[in-house]
A protein has these predicted regions:
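Surface-exposed loop and turn segments in beta-propeller and other repeat-based domains
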Residues: 55-76, 120-133, 176-185, 238-249, ...
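Asp-box/WD-like beta-propeller blade repeats and closely related beta-sheet repeat scaffolds
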Residues: 110-194
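Structural signature of eukaryotic scaffold interfaces centered on beta-propeller domains
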Residues: 2-21, 68-91, 133-144, 191-197, ...
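Short, conserved, GDST-rich strand-edge loop motifs in beta-rich repeat architectures
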Residues: 14, 19-20, 27-36, 82-93, ...
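Beta-propeller domains
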Residues: 2-5, 17-90, 96-124, 158, 180-356, ...
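Blade-level signature of beta-propeller repeat domains, shared across WD40, Kelch, NHL, RCC1
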Residues: 394-470
Length: 470
């Protein structure tokens, strides 16, 4: 019998764009407060021909509700086809779900019944801290030689945060990834350029800096993250620190070009101390992407919006404005469209980044927002809070999904009336522009929706070792 790779693995991003449409979404659902409810993984029907389209069709409750589930990922993906570390026998089966609140990691098996995953392993915080030296695991990515994860801090809740490794078969923790971290202390997201043996990491804050909400004193002092770091992926050594400037606070989501030949990507900055704007920066390698130093340039700036102080939460009243608060970005597999979530204003923006140094705004929609409270077209009289936050793109780039909860302690500061959670879908137009799907509006009773993953893979789940460019 022939052994064939998992059919959801693709050598190149262009081939992945030809994949069948997704039918299910996995959504991290957070319990907030002492209401007796537990955290959960929800399963949403994405098949437009289904009678249950846009509904929660499955759910697995976690043993406890204090995890603050965050950016989960698959045990294996298209990176398993990379020739330097081939693992084509692997299958995309397990979801690795980190909790930054509890330092637990839950492993879910989706194979037997994709609509009803089963928890097959729980890594407790004591084991995680003992084996990695870190706490608050944040983001999971499947790599060519195992599962990689980021963590916000050390065992005492301060720095440094960093990267840890996990065996993709047994889910045993291997330990810290870094051999030489150089000056790096703060951590958040990470991604890589597999064709160039380069990893990029970003910065938010340590657990002690974020767990009780945004600390205005630390923010105004420029103490949150404002750098990206470049690493030798193979040797696990720090190579270069790139500082965006201390006024650029919270350098979060990283989205590299999907083409492994390229050496550029985009990173979002939550807020500028100068004017409350948010921004998107492009990182790139000088000397035509060969052996030069890495650099950054600001390519998008989104201004704050003036607002009536009476409509603002206490944290913002003195500023008389709503900052955009860019909290997530995502890049389509063809590297053409960048999507940006503005969690403050409620705007969700599409940019054409075919020329990555010169993005062009091609569309936007509004849902929620601190002041705007924009309704969904399915319920035009229902004001919504929260705003576009975690965003995921289908492999063909035609469908975009987003949820509205950021992080519980920060939800309470910016939306003190309590985030009522929802998930929406946007249809992208081939030449640019987008429209909210009026038939897709999912509400989550008593739980808050965060990260979304699409069955079979999506635009931020996989990385590729083969280019579509000849």
């Amino acid at each position: 019998m022939a052994l064939l790779p998992d059919p959801t693995f693709y050598p190149s991003p262009g081939m992945a764009m030809q994949a069948p449409p997704e039918r299910l979404a996995y959504v991290a659902l957070l319990n907030v407060g002492n209401n007796g409810k537990r955290d959960a993984m929800g399963v949403v029907d994405l098949d437009p021909s289904s009678a249950e389209y846009g509904r929660l069709v499955g759910r697995v409750d976690f043993p406890r509700g204090d995890n603050e589930l965050h950016h989960f990922g698959w045990n294996a993906c298209s990176a398993c086809l990379c020739p330097q570390t081939p693992h084509a026998h692997m299958e995309r089966r397990y979801l690795i779900v980190p909790g930054i609140g509890s330092s637990r990691i839950h492993i879910l098996d989706t194979k037997a019944n994709p609509k009803q995953p089963k928890i097959v392993k729980v890594i407790e915080p004591e084991e995680f801290i003992k084996k990695t030296g870190y706490t608050s695991p944040h983001t999971i990515h499947c790599g060519p030689d195992g599962v990689y994860g980021s963590a916000l801090g050390a065992a005492n809740g301060d720095g440094p945060g960093g990267i840890f490794l996990m065996d993709a078969n047994t889910f045993e923790l291997k330990g810290q990834w870094e051999q030489d971290r150089g000056p790096q202390q703060l951590a958040y997201d990470f991604w890589w350029h597999l064709g160039h043996d380069a990893m990029v990491t970003s910065e938010w804050g340590t657990p002690n800096m974020v767990k009780d909400g945004l600390n205005a004193e630390l923010l105004l002092a420029g103490k949150y993250g404002h750098k990206i770091h470049i690493w030798d992926l193979d040797k696990r050594h720090h190579l270069q620190e790139v500082d965006l400037g201390a006024e650029q606070q919270m350098v979060l989501e990283l989205r590299p070009s999907h083409d492994p030949k390229k050496t550029y990507g985009f990173v979002g900055v939550v807020i500028s101390l100068k004017d409350l704007s948010s921004s998107i920066w492009m990182w790139y390698r000088e000397d035509d992407g060969k052996k030069g130093k890495w650099a950054v340039r600001k390519v998008i700036e989104i201004p704050a919006e003036p607002a009536d102080p009476d409509k603002l939460p206490p944290l913002l009243k003195g500023f008389k404005a709503v900052p955009p608060l860019v909290s997530d970005i995502n890049l389509s597999l063809d590297d053409r469209f960048l999507y940006v979530s503005c969690w403050g204003t409620g705007e969700f923006i599409q940019y054409d980044v075919s020329d990555p140094a010169n993005p062009k705004k091609t569309g936007s929609v509004y849902v929620g927002g601190i002041v705007r409270r924009a309704a969904h077209p399915s319920k035009p009289k229902q004001e919504l809070n929260g705003a576009p936050q975690m965003v995921e793109i289908s492999r063909d780039g035609k469908r975009i999904y987003f949820t509205n909860s950021l992080y519980s302690p920060w939800d309470e500061q910016f939306y003190p009336d309590g985030v009522k959670s929802w998930m929406v879908k946007v249809d992208a137009h081939p030449k640019g522009g987008m429209t909210l799907d009026e038939k897709f509006f999912v509400e989550f009773d008593g739980l808050r929706a965060h990260q979304v993953r699409l069955e079979g893979g999506d635009a931020s789940s996989d990385s590729y070792c083969f280019s579509d460019k000849k």
